[in-house]
Amino acid sequence: SITMVQALGGYAEANVWLIVAAVFFSRGIINSGLGKRIAYTLIRSFGTSSLKLAYALACTDLIISPATPSNTARGGGIVFPIVQNISLAFDSEPYGNTARRIGAYLMTTAHTINTITVTIFLTACSGNLLITSLGAKLFGYDISWWEWFQAGVIPGVICMILMPWFIYKIYPPEIKETPEAAAMAQKELDALGPITKAEISVAIIFVLCILLW
């Protein structure tokens, strides 16, 4: 058996509360609609081709990843529905012979980028925080948020720049130009309406916490 102190000792870990805070932020980004607004704004501005669409999705993942400690929630809750909407708009279904029109390329790229952003930010995945906590106990050195970022940002950004282009070359979509994407993104932004107080609050808290971390 274990003592009450041992049973509750985990609640004293700073990394545990960092995970809890980041989970709250991730729900705020998803529920407020801020994540979708960021994604559709980038698509409206840069999504004139399938390659640029991939980079817009990559930038979306990069922007929201510091406050979403689950790459599954980030990919499945924000990025995946957007990729699905874009694919269906171009009649690209996951089954049958239309997947290669654009959906397969965007989905493969989004999945790849989702795993890359995990390496850039400590709070992009709860597993990162567990690793640093375990490392601190075993080796007596606790890696800070800033130290993790310094170590991961250069290789991570290089991979983010190269991978959409690399996948585009080895697994190219049939549709190269996507002028309709901007109009689709604008339609989605119109449906979201003006930016809300909740989105502004989440954005301010998000930026402040990143600076404080």
Regions found by a protein language model. Give the residues of each.
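Structural signal for alpha-helical transmembrane segments and their membrane-water exit/capping regions
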Residues: 1-3, 22-33, 136, 167-176, ...
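Generic alpha-helical transmembrane segments of integral inner-membrane proteins
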Residues: 20, 24, 59, 63, ...
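Residues within alpha-helical transmembrane segments of multi-pass membrane proteins, especially transporters
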Residues: 24, 28, 59-63, 67, ...
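Generic alpha-helical secondary structure signal
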Residues: 54-58, 130, 206
